[in-house]
Structure formats: C-alpha cells, structure tokens
C-alpha cells in the first residue's frame, strides 16, 4: 500500500544507511588509530588487560634502567679491582726483593711500596659510580640491584633483586673496628697463615711473635727481619687470592645482570606483542571492510533516493 504519510521503504533505507555509516565510522577510527580496542567501550575486558600490561611494561622499562645503572656500577668496581690486583702484585714483587737486603735498600724499596699503597687507596676511592662505591665503604655491608618485576595471582607487585655482598669485595671500610670486618687490604692478617684474625697485633721490628699481623695497606719492610718479611709475603699472597675471589664474584654479578637485561628486553617485547594481539587492528582486514562499507554507503544513498521518489510517483497519478 502506498501512503503519503508513511514511507516504509524510505525508513528501511534510512536505517540501513545509518547502520552502514556507524560501521564506517568504526572502521575509519580503527584505521586512523591502529587500534581495534582503543577505549573501554570497545571491549572493557581487553582494554583493562591491555592497560595493565602497558603499565607493567613501563615498570619493566624502569627495571631495565636499574639494571643498566647496576651494570655501570659493577663495571666500575671490576675495573678498579683489576687495577688494585696489579698494584698488590707489584707490592708482592717489592716485598720479595726486600729479603736479604740492607736497611738502606729496604728504605728505597719501602718508598716504592708506600707509593703503591697510596695508589691503592686512590683506586678504591675512585671506584664510584653515581654515588655508589663498593670497594671503599663506610659501614655498607650489603646492597642490591632491582632486577625483576612481576605480579602474583592477586595482582600484587613483586620485585626481584640481585644482592651484592659488599663485605666480600670491599677493600677498605672506614667504619670497621676489627680486623675481620675491615676491608681486604686493611685488616691485620696473621703472618703464619695470612688470614685476617682479631687476635693479630702490630709486629715489633726484628722480633717474630705468634700474633704478628700484617696488612697490605700498612706493610713496611724497614727494620723487619727476613723471617718477618717472609710472613709479609704470605700475607700478600693470601690477600691476592682473596682479591681474585672478589673480582670473580664481581664478574659473576656482571654476567647475571647481562642475562637479566636480555631477558627483560625479551619480556617487554613479548608483552608488547600480547597487547597487540588484544587491541591492535588488522589493517588488511579493516582496509577491505572500508572499501566494502563505502560501496554499501553509496548503494544506501541510492536506495534512499529511490524510496523518497515514491511520493513523487503518487503525485504523478493525480496529475494524469
């Protein structure tokens, strides 16, 4: 039935065109932003998950920065420790050369040893990066580098860290008061064993005692007997071994940091891919849909135009 008051065909065509325009707007939005889910209204669950994952990735980026800073500190400590090892080895050669020497020659040798001792302190003092020094400390015994971030099943944040046993690698400790808590180079070591011992005491030149203690930092060959100098040599040997262990520990930490940095980088990439799977638009698909919807839009306009012409056709009937 034809009517001049109601045009069902035009209404149907208008509804179809409106639906096409809405779909076209959605596709154009996806193409312009690159997101299939750009707002919570698009898909609340996916948007929430993606937002949380993006936030986690920002935290992981901060963790990556922390690892980079830690790596720089470790590099600084390792470089300084290597230099210190070279200096202590030089001291060892000088102590060995002092055996059997006259006091005049011992004084000359001691002048060189003292220069190395001063350089050792300077090396340890300058092992500083961003205000942190693990070789020359003032009471610091432990430190840590933030190395990991995750969430548990309840959503609570969990942080992981790489612990630094500063006590095991420090060369000097200004706050230490006993031989066993002092740094590797300054704590007195028993001349008989080379081990740091709280019962060790300063030796008397020329007289060997069971409690004689020596430290690389304060070593002095002038006035001491050959037997005492041999004990000094034992102390320097054990000190070198301890420093080598410390350098090995530093190197192991550096390797852990490098591994964790690589893992964190891969984890961030994985999260980015996961977010993309949830919210990114498939541009090939959207491009195809855009073309189809544009055709539908043109057809809808033509259909609406034809439907609107029905009233004109009714008028022509009366004109006949």
Predicted regions and their residues:
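Short loop/turn microsegments at loop-to-beta-strand junctions
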Residues: 130, 290-291
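Amphipathic alpha-helical coiled-coil/heptad-repeat segments
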Residues: 1-10, 36-43, 47-269, 273-280, ...
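Alpha-helical coiled-coil
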Residues: 2-19, 23, 292
């Amino acid at each position: 039935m034809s009517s001049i008051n109601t045009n069902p065909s035009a209404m149907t065509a208008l509804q179809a065109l409106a639906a096409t325009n809405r779909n076209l707007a959605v596709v154009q939005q996806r193409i312009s932003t690159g997101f299939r889910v750009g707002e919570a209204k698009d898909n609340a669950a996916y948007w929430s998950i993606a937002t949380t994952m993006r936030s986690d990735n920002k935290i992981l980026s901060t963790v990556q920065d922390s690892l980079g800073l830690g790596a720089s500190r470790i590099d600084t400590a390792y470089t300084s420790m290597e230099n210190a090892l070279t200096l202590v080895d030089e001291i060892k050669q000088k102590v060995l050369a002092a055996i059997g020497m006259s006091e005049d020659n011992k004084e000359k040798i001691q002048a060189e040893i003292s220069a190395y001792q001063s350089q050792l302190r300077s090396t340890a003092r300058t092992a500083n990066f961003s205000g942190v020094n693990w070789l020359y400390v003032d009471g610091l015994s432990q430190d840590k580098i933030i190395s990991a971030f995750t969430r548990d099943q309840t959503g609570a944040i969990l942080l992981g860290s790489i612990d630094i046993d500063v006590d095991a690698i420090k060369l000097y400790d200004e706050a230490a008061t006993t031989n066993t808590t002092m740094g590797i180079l300054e704590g007195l070591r028993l001349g008989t064993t080379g081990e740091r011992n709280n019962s060790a005491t300063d030796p008397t030149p020329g007289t060997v005692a069971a409690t004689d203690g020596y430290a690389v930092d304060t070593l002095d060959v002038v006035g001491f007997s050959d037997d005492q100098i041999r004990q000094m040599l034992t102390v320097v040997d054990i000190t070198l071994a301890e420093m080598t262990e410390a350098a090995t520990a530093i190197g192991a930490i550096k390797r852990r940091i490098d591994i964790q940095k690589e893992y964190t980088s891969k984890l961030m990439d994985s999260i980015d891919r996961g977010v993309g799977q949830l919210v990114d638009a498939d541009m090939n698909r959207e491009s195809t849909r855009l073309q189809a919807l544009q055709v539908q839009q043109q057809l809808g306009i033509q259909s609406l135009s034809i439907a609107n012409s029905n009233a004109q056709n009714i008028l022509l009937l009366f004109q006949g």
